[in-house]
């Protein structure tokens, strides 16, 4: 199969939405029957985002094969059916690590290792490998044109443009076209300078995606076309919209997919965007609203919980309600108590690391349990629910996780002592082990207890979900917790590890050690999130009565 490559760059400012634009184009091409994948090339020196602060970088998205990747890969999976893997995201740090490892082995036969050709060749190899087996591979280059960090990636795609030829490569550049209120007009000069910068390193864009808070007038598009040496039909206006799921239709209406298909000489059907039209209709026509309290520690940056936010919205679509997320700092719960938890239709405690704010999450789980309020715990959210239950129901005073209190008399949650590395080798781990890449990661089979809420949600006796954690339920206390009324509704493939818990005599109190948000999509939703929002809606209706 001959793969075509679309390289996506960004200029003027960061955070223009390259990932959303790339995913939206991929969605249209997929709707035309093409097999599409997307890659993200990140220019930072970290090997992966696994140890980066969520308040700086946003969430870490975990793929099926256990790669810790950029949150943009979450956008990719929500827009297209293709599942991402570790080949779909790599960083400058990863490239340098692999090149230096080869140098130490002597693979370069004593050559002087340089950015060109050694680093650029390694980048090109990864891009070509990531695109194998697909009709089209869209490659997003992180950062902004002009940044020194991005230069090796830009040089690599420039070389690929020459090596593969125009019939297999296309360069798409996102840029900002701001509106100046004082002048009453949009300004094209930033775009002209951004394209000039791109051309100075040997890349001539074939398509310009012009971002702004309004549609760009025809005369300004003609001006951009003239000064940037791009066909006028390839100057695409991408205005701000109230839903990212409207963007595929917006790009389709301007013929972006036709331009791509014609450029690559592909024979394919017209795009069928009916599924996206249905999503947009559901989003615009809810029959009610529910308020979900998300109790976390990274709430100053909502992108730290990007996939959870989106999964809640998807579940709202399936239940025909709009979901309002109330972000609650778990430290505020510690300071003010349950007064900040009033007026909610459900509580969700997402994943997290570190001791800060953990007691607030435990209090949130207690409030939900005692007040019969729907509760959904994810990863750490399951662990705090179990700790709360152990302390206040099972009689294990001061029960805790050894992550937060190594001297606890009841370590109901403890460190996983074995893990499997990328090569499949089993290694022993202890408290002093490296933090990066040393977690239980990726898709795992989970057996579900017959008759449980989990089994009802999944409509079966098993599920496959993605993990990212170092700590597990301590099996020593399982029997005692079960006797107190806790239900272990999900177990690992060997039935040795607890994957899900529920509470008896509660409308909906469900928690999982895994991260179901990573597999939720706007078209399909996710059974656990759907069940949670359905329970929240039912709770609200009971309160209204």
UniProtKB/Swiss-Prot annotation:
Tell me which residues make up the Glutamine amidotransferase type-1 domain.
Answer: 291-542
* Summary of activators and inhibitors of this protein: Allosterically activated by GTP, when glutamine is the substrate; GTP has no effect on the reaction when ammonia is the substrate. The allosteric effector GTP functions by stabilizing the protein conformation that binds the tetrahedral intermediate(s) formed during glutamine hydrolysis. Inhibited by the product CTP, via allosteric rather than competitive inhibition.
Q: What does it catalyze?
A: UTP + L-glutamine + ATP + H2O = CTP + L-glutamate + ADP + phosphate + 2 H(+); L-glutamine + H2O = L-glutamate + NH4(+); UTP + NH4(+) + ATP = CTP + ADP + phosphate + 2 H(+)
Which InterPro entries does UniProt cross-reference here?
Class_I_gatase-like, CTP_synthase, CTP_synthase_N, GATASE, GATase1_CTP_Synthase, P-loop_NTPase
Tell me the residue numbers annotated for binding UTP: 14, 187-192, 223
Q: Pfam families annotated for this entry?
A: CTP_synth_N (PF06418), GATase (PF00117)
Q: Which residues bind L-glutamine?
A: 352, 380-383, 403, 470
- E.C. number, please? 6.3.4.2
One GO term (biological process): pyrimidine nucleobase biosynthetic process
- UniProt: ATP binding residues: 15-20, 72, 239-241
Checking PROSITE patterns in the record gives:
GATASE_TYPE_1 (PS51273)
Name the UniProt key words of this record, in alphabetical order: ATP-binding, Glutamine amidotransferase, Ligase, Magnesium, Metal-binding, Nucleotide-binding, Pyrimidine biosynthesis
State the pathway, as annotated in the record.
Pyrimidine metabolism; CTP biosynthesis via de novo pathway; CTP from UDP: step 2/2
Q: What would be one Gene Ontology cellular-component term for the protein?
A: cytosol
Q: Which residues does the annotation say bind Mg(2+)?
A: 72, 140
Q: Which residues bind CTP?
A: 14, 147-149, 187-192, 223
The active-site annotation reads 379, 515, 517
- Asked if the Swiss-Prot or TrEMBL record annotates the protein with the keyword Nucleotide-binding, the reply is yes
Fill in the subunit field for this protein: Homotetramer.
User: What function does the entry list?
Assistant: Catalyzes the ATP-dependent amination of UTP to CTP with either L-glutamine or ammonia as the source of nitrogen. Regulates intracellular CTP levels through interactions with the four ribonucleotide triphosphates.
The miscellaneous annotation reads: CTPSs have evolved a hybrid strategy for distinguishing between UTP and CTP. The overlapping regions of the product feedback inhibitory and substrate sites recognize a common feature in both compounds, the triphosphate moiety. To differentiate isosteric substrate and product pyrimidine rings, an additional pocket far from the expected kinase/ligase catalytic site, specifically recognizes the cytosine and ribose portions of the product inhibitor.
The name of this protein is: CTP synthase
Species of origin: Shewanella putrefaciens (strain CN-32 / ATCC BAA-453)
Q: Which gene encodes it?
A: pyrG
């Amino acid at each position: 199969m001959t793969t075509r490559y679309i390289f996506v760059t960004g200029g003027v400012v960061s955070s223009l939405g390259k990932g959303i634009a790339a995913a939206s184009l991929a969605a249209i091409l997929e709707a035309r029957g093409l097999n599409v994948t997307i890659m993200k090339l990140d220019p930072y020196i970290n090997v992966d985002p696994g140890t980066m602060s969520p308040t700086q970088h946003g969430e870490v998205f975990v793929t099926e094969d256990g790669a810790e990747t950029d949150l943009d890969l979450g956008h990719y999976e929500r827009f297209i059916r293709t599942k991402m893997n570790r080949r779909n995201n790599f960083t400058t740090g990863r490239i340098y690590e692999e090149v230096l490892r080869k140098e130490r082995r002597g693979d370069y036969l004593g050559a002087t290792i340089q950015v060109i050709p050694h680093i650029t060749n390694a980048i090109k190899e990864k891009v070509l490998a990531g695109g194998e087996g697909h009709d089209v591979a869209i490659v997003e280059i992180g950062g902004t044109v002009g940044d020194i960090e991005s230069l090796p990636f830009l040089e690599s795609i420039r070389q690929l443009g020459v090596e593969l030829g125009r019939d297999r490569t296309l360069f798409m550049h996102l840029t900002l076209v701001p509106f100046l209120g004082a002048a009453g007009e949009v300004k094209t000069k930033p775009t002209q300078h951004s394209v000039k910068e791109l051309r100075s390193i040997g890349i001539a864009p074939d398509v310009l995606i012009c971002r702004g808070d309004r549609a760009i007038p025809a005369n300004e598009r003609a001006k951009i076309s003239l000064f940037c040496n791009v066909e006028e039909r390839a100057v695409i206006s991408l205005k701000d919209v109230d839903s990212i799921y409207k963007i595929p239709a917006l790009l389709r209406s301007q013929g972006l997919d036709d331009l791509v298909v014609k450029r690559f000489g592909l024979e394919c059907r017209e795009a069928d965007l009916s599924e996206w039209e249905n999503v947009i209709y559901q989003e615009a026509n809810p029959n009610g609203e529910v308020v979900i309290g998300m109790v976390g520690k990274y709430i100053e940056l909502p992108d730290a919980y990007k996939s959870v936010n989106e999964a809640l919205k998807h579940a709202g679509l399936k239940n025909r309600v709009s979901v309002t997320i109330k972000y609650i700092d778990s430290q505020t719960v510690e300071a003010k108590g349950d007064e900040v938890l009033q007026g909610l239709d459900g509580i969700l405690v997402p994943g997290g690391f570190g001791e800060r704010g953990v007691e607030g999450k435990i209090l949130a789980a207690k409030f939900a349990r005692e007040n019969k309020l729907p509760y959904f715990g994810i990863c750490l959210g399951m662990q705090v629910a179990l700790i709360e239950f152990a302390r206040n129901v099972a009689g294990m005073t001061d029960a805790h996780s050894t992550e937060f209190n190594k001297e606890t008399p009841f370590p109901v949650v403890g460190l996983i002592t074995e893990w499997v590395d990328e090569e499949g080798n089993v290694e022993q781990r202890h408290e002093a082990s490296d933090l990066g890449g040393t977690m239980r990661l990726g898709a795992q089979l989970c057996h579900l207890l017959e008759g449980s809420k989990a089994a009802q949600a999944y409509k079966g006796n098993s599920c496959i979900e993605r993990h990212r954690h170092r700590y597990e339920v301590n099996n020593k206390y399982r029997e005692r917790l079960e006797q107190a009324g806790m239900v272990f509704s999900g177990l690992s493939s060997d039935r040795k590890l607890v994957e899900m818990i529920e509470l008896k005599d509660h409308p909906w109190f469900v928690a999982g050690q895994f991260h179901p948000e990573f597999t939720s999509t706007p078209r399909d939703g996710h059974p656990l999130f759907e069940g949670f929002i359905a329970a929240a809606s039912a709770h609200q209706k009971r309160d209204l009565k």
